[in-house]
Structure formats: structure tokens, C-alpha cells
Amino acid sequence: MLGVVPLAPAIDIADETYVGCPPAALAPVVAEPATWARWWPDLRLSVTRDRGIKGQQWAVRGALTGSMEIWLEPIGPGTVVHWFLRADPPGAARPARSGGLDKERQRRVKAWKAHAFALKDRLEGAERVT
């Protein structure tokens, strides 16, 4: 029996940022709901999987509907922070390519990188690894 193949989400982002400190320094920040509200004020997140030192997975509601994850991967003395956002604007038509969706993707990536680099600067200043 053939099934229906679901469409890929309109917003599908994967990003990586190296932070020169161990996952144990990052995990409490990632797990803090106040951090989420600062980073994504237009999204309502609910934890679907608390991975502890490995990160968090969330269901996303609000300006977008879907899922998001931060995975903390230990690499040498530091951590690669993987950020995944797979979501759609609620109730929106989903053209294959849309200037509005492209701008939304770019806006989300740019905002995330600003948060990731601010976190990197703050934590590496406190726990710099060489």
C-alpha cells in the first residue's frame, strides 16, 4: 500500500557553532526556559525530550509550528552546538520557493547566530579551553 509522503517543512534549518567549553557548561543554559524566551520570543516551546547534557528537543508553536532541537556534541575540549528548526508558518500556503519564506529562514538563521555567538563569547570567557 502506498502512503502519502509528507511535505518537508517550509523552514528547515540546521546550523553548527563550535563553543570552546564542555557540554556541561552549555546544557544548563539550553535547558533554561528563560533562555528560550529571550532567544525565540515569538515561539512557545514545550520540551518533548530532555537529553540532559546532550541538549533539548521541543515542540514549537506560535509564529511557527513544528519542532526544534539543540544537540550538544562534545568535540575535543569543546562542544559543537547543533541547532535544528523544522517548522511551518501556521495555516500558511506552502509554495516550493517563496521570497517570504526565504526571508524568514534568513532572519531565523541570523538571529540564531547572534545568540550562539553571544553565548560563545560569554562561556568561553569564563571557561576557555585551548
What are the residue ranges of the model-derived segments?
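Hydrophobic ligand-binding cavity/cleft-lining segments
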Residues: 1-46
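Intrinsic-disorder/low-complexity, polar/charged segments enriched in Ser/Thr/Lys/Arg/Asp/Glu/Gln
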Residues: 10-16, 55, 67, 80-82
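Hydrophobic/aromatic beta-strand elements that line small-molecule binding cavities or substrate pockets
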Residues: 16-17, 46-49, 67-74, 84-87
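A short, structured loop/turn motif at beta-sheet edges
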Residues: 20-24, 50-53, 72-80, 126
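Signature tryptophan residues that serve as conserved aromatic anchors
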Residues: 36-40, 58, 83
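Short beta-strand segments that buttress and anchor functional surface loops
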Residues: 55-63
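Coil-to-beta-strand transition motifs
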Residues: 63-65, 74-80, 99
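A conserved amphipathic terminal alpha-helix motif
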Residues: 88-130
